[in-house]
């Protein structure tokens, strides 16, 4: 049920016509405001516009957060001339701690994106007969939500912890293959871009995040599913190379005297 607000205003300006003019000098006005019921608001909203807007807002907040972190660490040199080299150092780093921090930032960002899609799914289910999402859009958002939470949020957060902890726990100065470590991280944004390309083209993957056949085979898949599979290949390559890097580091870079059974439990 919608709500209607009516505001009546009255202003006496003292210009009544003569002593017996009564209220002829009063100025009256009325303002009417209507609030549509939630069902109509949800039905009229474009889910892809809502998703794009919220992701853009999240990216802007992330940019402001980076600027604030730079300001807190460099309060006396808060200019673009200093900020550009600072951010370039982070984007090109091979240091295991910085790469781990990049994993944390990416994981938390996509955790928010996955939460946004979960919220939109719950909006669809909140009202009986709601058509905020069509059947195809619901399947697409369900697929993207699961994919984002597992492959773009949980896995980067785990890799972030591993990048920070494994070299420190075994006494290694860095991972065995630092450049491969950096490349493994940057494969994740590439995979995310491919995965989300389909949904913004109007043909997002609707296979479920597990990608079971026959939904992903060539006879039934559309462009969005193809892009989703390509993105998954990038993410699988990222996690595989990361695993190889960690195994190599643990095998050949342990501190002298540390055997396989002397390593910390986390490693």
Regions found by a protein language model. Name each.
Residues 1-267:
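...captures the hydrophobic TM-helix bundle architecture rather than a specific catalytic motif
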């Amino acid at each position: 049920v919608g709500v209607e607000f009516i505001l009546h205003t009255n202003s006496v300006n003292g210009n009544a016509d003569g002593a017996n003019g009564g209220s002829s000098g009063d100025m009256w006005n009325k303002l009417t405001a209507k609030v549509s019921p939630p069902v109509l608001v949800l039905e009229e909203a474009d889910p892809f516009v809502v998703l794009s807007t919220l992701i853009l807002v999240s990216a802007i907040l992330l940019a402001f957060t980076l600027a604030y972190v730079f300001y807190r660490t460099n309060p006396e040199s808060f200019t673009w001339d200093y900020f550009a080299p600072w951010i370039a150092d982070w984007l090109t780093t091979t240091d295991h701690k910085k790469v781990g921090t990049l994993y944390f930032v990416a994981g938390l960002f996509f955790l928010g994106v996955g939460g946004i899609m979960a919220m939109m799914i719950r909006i669809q289910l909140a009202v009986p007969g709601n058509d905020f999402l069509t059947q195809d859009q619901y399947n697409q958002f369900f697929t993207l939500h699961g994919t984002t939470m597992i492959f773009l949020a949980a896995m980067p957060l785990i890799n972030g912890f591993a990048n920070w902890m494994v070299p420190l726990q075994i006494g290694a100065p860095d991972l065995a293959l630092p450049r491969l470590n950096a490349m493994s991280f940057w494969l994740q944004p590439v995979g995310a871009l491919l995965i989300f390309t389909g949904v913004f083209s109007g043909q997002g993957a609707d296979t479920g995040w597990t990608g079971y056949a026959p939904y992903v085979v060539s006879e039934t898949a559309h462009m969005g599913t193809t892009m989703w599979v390509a993105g998954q290949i990038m993410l699988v390559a990222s996690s595989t190379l990361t695993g190889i890097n960690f195994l190599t580091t643990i095998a050949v870079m342990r501190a002298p005297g540390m055997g396989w059974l002397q390593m910390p439990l986390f490693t």
